[in-house]
Every structure is written in structure tokens, then in C-alpha cells.
A protein has these predicted regions:
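Extended ligand-binding clefts on enzyme/binding-domain cores
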Residues: 5-117, 124-126
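C-terminal capping/lid segments that line or modulate ligand- or cofactor-binding pockets
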Residues: 53-73, 111-192
Length: 192
């Protein structure tokens, strides 16, 4: 759109649209596969020869973030199946502890959950209770710093990486603005 509307570069815009179509076709042809008991899901990686990696990483973009990125809707059947997989113990990057649960990353130690993953879970949810649970976990896990961290030990919020992670803080602010607009969460006027 920018190439076409701002720079009037129709030829370049056409090449980009063609490439986008080829990528979309590749995702549909090679990136969706059956994974019992979840059904058809998006693979995290594929070689196009029938080999797949099943997982999701808490970063954005991620499979969990697909509706946030407007690739599909949260009601898309393949996405719903993929989301169920991502937020389950079957995902090797999903961790559940006594303080928080959610998606982590191979980039940080096993057992650490990323606030970005919890925030993305809330941003892509239509369930007010799930959103509230996500916010409550985030509020319970900042270790008294009032900042979102890169990752947090699911059992010990004092054990975290990056004391101040602007990416997570920015997404958390976006989440709070959205839930305020929707009127689905009240932190009780505690300034949290």
C-alpha cells in the first residue's frame, strides 16, 4: 500500500503483492498440518517436504499473535486449534508454575515465561475472564519493579531476565488501554 499510495510505485507494489500471494499459498499448502488431538494447526516451521516443528515462541510475530497481526481472525478454526496447542503442555515452550503460566522461549531458560506471551494471549482473547487472569498474572510477577521483564521464572517472580524490557512494557500499556476501552477489567483503583 505504501509503495502504491505514497510513492506511486505500481510495479514494485505489484511485485510485493505477488510475493505475498506466493507466501500465503505456501503457508496454506505446507504450513498447516494435522496434529492430534488438536486438529489442523499452523506449524512453527516446515521444510515443505512433510517435516514440521511444533512449538511457539513468546515473541511477536508468533503463531499466537496471528490475529493481533491481522493475518487471521481469532475465530479462524486453524488458529483456534493452534492456540489450544500453544497454550498447552504439548508446546515445549509452555511453562506453568505457582505464580504464572504461559509461553516462554528457547532464548531464555526452561521454566521462564515471557510477559509478552501472556500479553499476546490476552490481546488475542475474546474471553474477559482469560484476559483478567492474564493481567492478574502480570501484576503478580513484576517483582515489585512495576516493569514488565523479558522472562520470569514461573515459580519465582524475583528470578527474571531484563529488569526493564520496553517491548513488553509497551505491549502491556496497549493491553491496558484496550481493556479499559472495553470495560472488562478493574484493578480496584490501586494505580496498577
Amino acid at each position: 500500500e505504501i509503495l502504491r499510495t505514497v510513492y506511486q510505485e505500481e510495479e514494485s507494489a505489484g511485485k510485493c503483492r505477488k510475493l505475498a500471494g506466493e507466501i500465503e499459498d505456501g503457508i496454506k499448502r505446507y504450513g498447516i498440518t494435522e496434529l492430534p488431538p488438536f486438529g489442523k494447526i499452523y506449524a512453527y516451521e516446515t521444510d515443505g517436504l512433510g517435516n514440521y516443528v511444533f512449538m511457539d515462541d513468546a515473541n511477536c510475530p508468533s503463531l499466537l499473535s496471528l490475529p493481533y497481526l491481522e493475518y487471521c481472525t481469532a475465530e479462524d478454526e486453524v488458529y483456534k486449534n493452534t492456540r489450544a496447542y500453544i497454550l498447552s503442555e504439548e508446546n515445549p515452550c509452555y511453562f506453568s508454575g505457582s505464580v504464572i503460566k504461559g509461553v516462554g522461549s528457547p532464548h531464555t531458560k526452561k521454566g521462564n515465561v515471557w510477559p509478552i506471551g501472556i500479553i499476546m494471549q490476552a490481546l488475542t482473547s475474546g474471553d474477559a475472564e482469560e484476559i483478567k487472569e492474564c493481567i492478574d498474572m502480570l501484576l503478580a510477577s513484576h517483582a515489585g519493579t512495576d516493569y514488565m521483564h523479558e522472562s520470569i521464572n514461573a515459580d519465582d517472580p524475583e528470578d527474571y531476565t531484563r529488569s526493564w524490557f520496553a517491548w513488553a512494557n509497551s505491549l502491556f500499556a496497549e493491553l491496558l488501554i484496550r481493556v479499559k476501552e472495553l470495560g472488562i477489567y478493574d484493578a480496584g483503583g490501586k494505580g496498577q
